[in-house]
């Protein structure tokens, strides 16, 4: 579903798209979830060299709030939380695949 209020804030559809996936970490998080499947917090933390716990938690929350990923919490001790990409998030994989290809070739 399109967030018209959010979309109307931008004059350019590229700006609108970047409002969902812009920044250093969001594309990388989406890439891992889109290409490798479900991850737990610790798995993502190990794959994202240099990210702080605070930044990872913030990025995951924003991606979940934007419905690009799902945060599934299991009622157990110790707590278990898994993250997976949504259909909306998968819609960005074509862009990320092109970025990945460009990065390999240049």
From Swiss-Prot:
Q: Which PROSITE patterns does the record associate with it?
A: HTH_HXLR (PS51118)
| A Pfam family per the record | HxlR
GO molecular function terms here?
DNA binding
Which InterPro entries does this entry report, sorted A to Z?
HTH_HxlR (IPR002577), WH-like_DNA-bd_sf (IPR036388), WH_DNA-bd_sf (IPR036390)
| Keyword terms of this UniProt record | DNA-binding, Transcription, Transcription regulation
* HTH hxlR-type domain sequence ranges: 12-106
The protein's job, in short, is:
Potential regulator of the malBH genes.
Task: Tell me the PANTHER family matching this sequence.
Answer: TRANSCRIPTIONAL REGULATOR, TRANSCRIPTIONAL REGULATOR, MARR FAMILY
Q: What is this protein called?
A: Putative regulatory protein MalR
Query: What organism does the UniProt record list as the source?
Result: Fusobacterium mortiferum
